């Protein structure tokens, strides 16, 4: 699968010995064996500067053996303070290699990969063959947001936000166990935006997460944010129909 990547993307499977390689190595934590392909967790971290002149612009997750290759593209900014991300997505049954690509503002794109075996696929409707049924309807509701009660000035704190929204690919797996066909319209969250700042009428856009129909149901996102001012933290999800779901917390720093 390395040949799939353009030569401009440098693949690092180990941290390396140079400062450049250590900074751009992507640490990926996920199960080697995933029993449920509808909910595969992944955590990504990098020991990379997150300063205005040198930071990680984005992280993308791909599985080339899946019918829907792109699992998400996640933009970051220096306001995050460090590079860390956890979420959950869907994969088809079988042996796969998950690729993570990070783009540095100075040094271009870097990648790493991890092997994963999925016991039961989660990219298609329930069942196989012409008689397959769409999964039961899932509820849609407001997201939930958690931040620490006490946040110090300059602290890089953890943000947890959980959506209440289903993901349906609209694909059906045929009886041969290999062929996917379109059997319905996808249902999914299309994006997540993170705003933070003292001015409610013009808040700073910190993150834009471009999401897909292979996200897990009711996904939980965990990522960092640097506390540099008092103000509103607001997270906005938008789904495939243009519906918006918002949640917010007031950030008040305490020494």
PLM regions: where:
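Extracellular Ig-like/FN3 beta-sandwich strand-entry sites
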Residues: 93-97, 156, 228-232
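Short acidic/polar inter-strand loop motif in beta-rich domains
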Residues: 103-112, 238-248
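A short beta-turn/strand-edge loop motif at beta-sheet boundaries
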Residues: 49-55, 167-173, 182-187
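Aromatic sugar-binding surface patches on proteins
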Residues: 77-86, 212-222
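Beta-strand signatures of extracellular beta-sandwich domains
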Residues: 58-62, 190-195, 236
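Low-complexity, Pro/Ser/Thr- and charge-rich linker/hinge segments at domain boundaries
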Residues: 120-142, 254-255
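N-terminal edge beta-strand
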Residues: 9-39, 132-157
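Short edge beta-strand/loop segments characteristic of extracellular beta-sandwich folds
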Residues: 29, 41-50, 158-166, 179-181
């Amino acid at each position: 699968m390395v040949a799939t990547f353009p030569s401009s993307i440098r693949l690092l499977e180990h941290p390396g010995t140079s400062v450049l390689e250590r900074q751009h190595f992507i640490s990926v934590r996920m199960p080697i064996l995933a029993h449920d392909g509808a909910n595969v967790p992944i955590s990504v971290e990098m020991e990379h500067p997150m300063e205005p002149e040198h930071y990680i612009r984005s992280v993308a997750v791909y599985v080339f053996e899946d019918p829907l290759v792109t699992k998400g593209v996640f933009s970051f900014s220096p306001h995050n303070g460090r590079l860390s991300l956890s979420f959950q997505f869907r994969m088809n049954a079988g042996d796969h290699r998950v690729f993570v690509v990070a783009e540095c503002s100075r040094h271009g794109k870097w990648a790493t990969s991890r092997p994963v075996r999925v016991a039961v696929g989660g990219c298609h409707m329930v069942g196989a063959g012409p008689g397959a049924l769409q999964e039961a309807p899932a509820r849609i509701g407001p997201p939930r947001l958690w931040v620490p009660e006490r946040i110090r000035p300059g602290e890089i704190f953890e943000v947890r936000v959980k959506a209440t929204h289903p993901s349906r690919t609209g694909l059906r797996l045929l009886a041969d166990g290999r062929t996917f066909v379109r059997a319905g319209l996808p249902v999914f969250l299309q994006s997540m935006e993170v705003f933070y700042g003292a001015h409610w009428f013009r808040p700073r856009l910190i993150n834009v997460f471009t999401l897909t129909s292979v996200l897990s149901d009711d996904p939980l996102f965990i990522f960092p944010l640097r506390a540099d001012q008092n103000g509103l933290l607001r997270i906005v999800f938008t789904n495939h129909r243009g519906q918006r779901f918002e949640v917010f917390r007031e950030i008040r720093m305490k020494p």
